[in-house]
UniProtKB/Swiss-Prot annotation:
This is CTP synthase 1-B. The gene is ctps1-b. Disulfide bonds: none annotated. It is an enzyme of class 6 (ligase). Residues 562-572 have a biased composition (Basic and acidic residues). This enzyme is involved in the de novo synthesis of CTP, a precursor of DNA, RNA and phospholipids. Catalyzes the ATP-dependent amination of UTP to CTP with either L-glutamine or ammonia as a source of nitrogen. GO terms for molecular function: ATP binding; CTP synthase activity; identical protein binding. It catalyses: UTP + L-glutamine + ATP + H2O = CTP + L-glutamate + ADP + phosphate + 2 H(+). One of its GO terms (cellular component) is cytoophidium. It comes from Xenopus laevis. InterPro entries: Class_I_gatase-like (IPR029062), CTP_synthase (IPR004468), CTP_synthase_N (IPR017456), GATASE (IPR017926), GATase1_CTP_Synthase (IPR033828), P-loop_NTPase (IPR027417).
Length: 591
């Protein structure tokens, strides 16, 4: 097993996750099996109870693990399936060690950070690195480990010490350290400054880890003189200083690393069995990056939510929209709308914000209401859904978005004026959305319906069934505490709101579609978690197709994209990558 540790310096949030994912991508393109581990030095057991403002979205895995959004990057880049143990936190490690101490496993010894915590970290990494993450079930050959935070933080000290020890346990030919650092370029002088990187590497080396590659994040390509200066002061060769400057899309990052000889370096440094033949996967990434820059037409989607000021709160949703837009060769324009701005209260207090929000909504090609929690902004979301339904505007509701679509329909079409979710009004006389029996209101963490679940289609004419390739069932990831009230299903369906997908018991409403509408779909699960750059999520793909007026044509063609639909350059000589043109949908295992 080969281990590649990715650390960061100067500031957090400089792209360690994308760089770690890109390293994994170029290794996977060399026919290696790659897995990833993300280490978060916070004391929380997992990311499940985080506020989206605090830490971005909570990414959900097949096994129900609520983890850091960087694991979403790993899954999308590498097309792998991770588990909750691929996200290691200080809380998990301390909980594990304390449980052992309570059982008497340490035989009365004084339990300390060194050696007990550090050894537990190493054991966790070695154990998890061997778990297969690819569909073929083959054991990984390379494990890319991202250490969150910045070097020197008090929180990350036990992890840095653990890897200082681990480099000797794994042996030099099996362990490599990539250090990601910022090279700022003040606008006043325009000069690239190396001092922050020098100090960061010096601190890392003082803690016992010496970087093999120094990856410099900068706004423009590094000057040769700057590379040489970093090389001299950071104790590395000039070819070990890698520049990752700002690029048009993240699809360019693996290509940037490959161009600078990172694969050749790993071949020698880690003695990896990598040939010199052209790498087909990277050719696909290059094709995607080139296509992204050639897009001529655009499609606007209104994202109506309550966390719109912080785009990381909807990271996977945004990626799923981007994947779908790229598949039909349209540039995506997302219009972020705070749902509270659509409410009558805002009209009274801030009429300008109210009218600006409605102008954004009305001028969009499609509307998306993603998942969320809490009562704030829900009436605004319901107003947006009502507008989409009445104006025949393509609409997708995810999780809470689906629940509110049912609430809006019940209020307006069935004339149940007080219809609501018991989450927002426990005393409503028409509880259209109710809490599930499994829900434990006394405890927040891990009490939701989580992870991969099967949804059975109950309608042959369902648009969603066609978008999923005509399969009898699909398996998608869930994260919710509330569900549509199954007792009201018959009354809702009688008026045209069809529940075309249910769980395996037929009790939980999973997919809803509205009759006589171009595209009005709600899904209880979160399809964005399984969207991939070359395999867009069907619900999001349907929204984009409907928004550009091509959904009917796509379905008539047997759910296949024509070359004309998938290429922005309309010249006769253009021909798209066939593998992207004929859209790949997520693999479904039939037992």
């Amino acid at each position: 097993m080969k281990y590649i540790l990715v650390t960061g310096g100067v500031i957090s949030g400089i792209g360690k996750g994308v760089i770690a994912s890109s390293v994994g991508t170029i290794l996977k393109s060399s026919n290696l099996h790659v897995t990833s581990i993300k280490i978060d030095p916070y004391i929380n057991i997992d990311a499940g109870t985080f506020s989206p403002y605090e830490h971005g979205e909570v990414f959900v895995l097949d096994d129900g693990g609520e983890v850091d959004l960087d694991l979403g990057n790993y899954e999308r880049f590498l097309d792998i399936r991770l588990t909750k143990d691929n996200n290691l936190t200080t809380g998990k490690i301390y909980q594990s060690v304390i449980n052992k101490e309570r059982k008497g496993d340490y035989l009365g010894k004084t339990v300390q950070v060194v050696p007990h915590i550090t050894e537990a970290i190493q054991e966790w990494v070695m154990r998890q690195a061997l778990i297969p993450v690819d569909e073929d079930g083959i054991e990984p050959e390379v494990c890319v480990i991202e250490l969150g935070g910045t070097v020197g933080d008090i929180e990350s000290m036990p992890f840095v010490e653990a890897f200082r020890q681990f480099q000797f346990k794994a042996r030099r030919e099996n362990f490599c350290n990539i250090h990601v650092s910022l090279v700022p370029q003040p606008s006043a002088t325009g000069e690239q400054k190396t001092k922050p990187t020098q100090n960061s590497v010096r601190e890392l080396r003082g803690l016992g880890l010496s970087p093999d590659l120094v990856v410099c994040r900068c706004s423009t390509p590094l000057d040769t003189s700057v590379k040489e200066k970093i090389s001299m002061f950071c104790h590395v060769e000039p070819q070990q200083v890698i520049c990752v400057h700002d690029v048009s899309s993240i699809y360019r990052v693996p290509l940037l690393l490959e161009e600078q000889g990172v694969v050749d370096y790993f071949r020698q440094r880690l003695d990896l069995p990598i040939g010199r033949q052209p790498r087909r996967l990277l050719m696909k990434w290059k094709e995607m990056a080139d296509r992204y820059e050639r897009l001529l037409e655009s499609c606007s989607i209104a994202l109506v939510g309550k966390y719109t000021k912080f785009s990381d709160s909807y990271a996977s949703v945004i990626k799923a929209l981007e994947h779908s837009a790229l598949a039909i060769n349209h540039r995506l324009e997302i219009k972020y709308i705070d749902s509270a701005d659509l409410e009558q209260e805002t009209l009274q207090e801030e009429p300008v914000r109210y009218h600006e929000a409605w102008q954004k909504l009305c001028s969009s090609d499609g509307i998306l209401v993603p998942g969320g929690f809490g009562v704030r902004g829900t009436e605004g979301k319901i107003q947006a859904i009502a507008w989409a339904r009445k104006q025949k505007k393509p609409f997708l509701g995810v999780c809470l978005g689906m629940q509110l679509a049912v609430v809006e329909f019940a209020r307006d079409v069935l004339d149940w004026k007080d219809a609501n979710s018991t989450e927002f009004n426990p005393k409503t006389s028409h509880p259209v959305v109710i809490d599930m029996p499994e829900h434990n209101p006394g405890q927040m963490g891990g009490t939701m319906r989580l992870g991969k679940r099967r949804t059975i289609f109950h309608s042959q004419n369902s648009v969603m069934k066609k978008l999923y390739g005509g399969h009898e069932y699909v398996e998608e990831r869930h994260r919710h505490r509330y569900e549509v009230n199954p007792e009201l299903r018959r009354e809702l369906e009688a008026r045209g709101l069809k529940f075309v997908g249910q769980d395996t018991e037929g009790e939980r409403m999973e997919i809803v579609e509205l009759e006589d509408h171009p595209y009005f779909v709600g899904v209880q699960y979160h399809p964005e978690f399984l969207s991939r750059p070359i395999k867009p999520s069907p619900p999001y793909f349907g929204l984009l197709l409907a928004s550009v007026g091509r959904l009917s044509q796509y379905i008539e063609r047997g759910c296949r994209l024509s070359p004309r639909d998938t290429y922005s350059d309309r010249s006769e000589n253009s021909s798209p990558d066939a593998e992207i043109a004929e859209l790949k949908l997520p693999m479904i295992d039939h037992e």
